[in-house]
Amino acid sequence: MIAQELSENQKLTTAMSEKSRAGYALRTFMSDEEFRAAASALVASSVQTQRIPVVMQLPSPLQMLYSTTRAVQPDLDYDFDDDDAENAAIYCADWLRTFNGTQIAGLIFDEREGEVAEEAYQPIKNIAEHYQWVIGVRRDNEVLFSSPKITIPVLPSMYWTSGEVTIKTSGAIFTEIARDAVPEQVLDFREKLS
């Protein structure tokens, strides 16, 4: 939804480009009321269709900073650091308040395109603690949660098309079902994991 909004919402990206200061595009994006309402409605309806706790995956604050800046200044070369990531986390934390009533159980921040210092997440940790959400970070082969301290292996999405298990699958795993997976085959492969 975030990528689609950045590529298709011309009115919003125009507003995001009004100032070139680092973080302005992200701040404008995260504070847009229409986007906030649409994101909240999508998450709320997704949670309501499940009978188990739902954890929402998002880009890391640093990745959000890169994505929003790239959306309005695609030809510039950027180099953001951990301080920029922490500033971005402030805007993200404010945006996350939108999901207060959605009944999500936690958040996973995708760091596959670049790790973020744990301290940079402090604004988000404060919000998560208030709402009693768990926080994890996704890396290439694992999802790491700090409180409680848990590491969950990532089952590659190719499993859902090949059936080949490349990791130990006892206990919890994290996975994404491949777009080209056949639904009946997915059900069979899911049974193999049990």
Where in this protein do the model-derived segments appear?
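Active-site-proximal loop/turn and secondary-structure-junction residues that shape catalytic pockets
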Residues: 1-2, 58-62, 113-114, 141-143
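An N-terminal, globular interaction/scaffold subdomain
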Residues: 1-7, 152-154
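Active-site-proximal, glycine-rich beta->alpha crossover segments in alpha/beta enzymes
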Residues: 5-98
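Generic structural signal for hydrophobic
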Residues: 46, 99, 128, 189-190
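Aromatic-lined carbohydrate-recognition surfaces of secreted/lumenal glycan-active proteins
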Residues: 56, 109, 129-146
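Alpha/beta enzyme core
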Residues: 88-107, 124, 133
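Active-site-adjacent beta->alpha loops and helix N-cap segments on the catalytic face
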Residues: 115-121
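Catalytic-face loop-and-helix region of soluble metabolic enzyme cores
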Residues: 137-194
